[in-house]
Amino acid sequence: MEHIGAGLALLGVAGPGIGIGILTGLATQAMGRNPDAAPVIRANMIIGAALAEGLGILAFVVGILLALQ
């Protein structure tokens, strides 16, 4: 049962990956439309990507911990 739980926990890594892809695509479009706002958009994009990546790492660690029990 632990391995099933670990596999389900690792599905949580897919969400942040999709989120980062959408975030990057929309930020690139926004910078293309308004180049003057690029520094602000880039900073917000990096913060959002870091938060999403943190969730992915947390799901990965939970999956590893469940697999090792």
Residue ranges with predicted function:
Residues M1-Q69:
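Hydrophobic, small-residue-rich transmembrane alpha-helices and their short perimembrane loops
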